Every structure is written in structure tokens, then in C-alpha cells.
From Swiss-Prot:
It comes from Danio rerio (Zebrafish). It comes from the Eukaryota. Residues 69-84 have a biased composition (Basic and acidic residues). This is Spermatogenesis-associated protein 45. The lineage of its organism: Eukaryota, Metazoa, Chordata, Craniata, Vertebrata. Residues 54-84 are annotated as: Disordered.
Length: 84
């Protein structure tokens, strides 16, 4: 037996993880068959259903006077440079 034939025989006896080389009973099965809810949506959309658009924008109703932390401008010279 030549070296190439021995190498071929050795490789034929090794375990393979390739799905194509296994029998069709393994690669024809659906992957998630044992999960009951594999097609159900897991997104939580209850937050979108509870608040109306009026409720979501209620914080803006007082004209911006209810802000506890007004906007701070750091490095005033850098953002006023275009006015010079």
C-alpha cells in the first residue's frame, strides 16, 4: 500500500463533524425542532402599547422650564469662534 493510500484510509476512519458527510437523517432535521416557542417573537412591545404620544411628550408641555439640569456649554471660546 502506498503512502497516499494509507493517508486516505487514515482520513476515512477519522471522525468528521461535517453535516454533508453524515447521513441525511441528521442534516434534514430542523435545527430547533425540540423548542416549542422557536417561532415566537421575544420582543417586549408592551411599552409601545401602554403610552400614547401625548403621554410620551408630556415632559415638554411646560415650555422647557421644568429642566432641572440646564445645558452646559464647556469651552465657550470654541463654539463662539465662528461669530468673530
Amino acid at each position: 500500500m502506498s503512502k497516499q493510500e494509507r493517508l486516505y484510509e487514515l482520513n476515512m476512519h477519522r471522525e468528521t463533524w461535517c453535516r454533508v458527510e453524515t447521513t441525511s437523517k441528521y442534516w434534514n432535521l430542523p435545527e430547533r425542532k425540540h423548542f416549542r416557542c422557536h417561532l415566537q417573537n421575544t420582543c417586549d412591545i408592551s411599552a409601545l402599547q401602554t403610552a400614547s404620544p401625548e403621554q410620551r411628550s408630556a415632559w415638554m408641555s411646560s415650555g422647557g422650564q421644568n429642566t432641572a439640569h440646564p445645558e452646559r456649554r464647556h469651552f465657550e471660546d470654541s463654539y463662539r469662534a465662528h461669530l468673530v
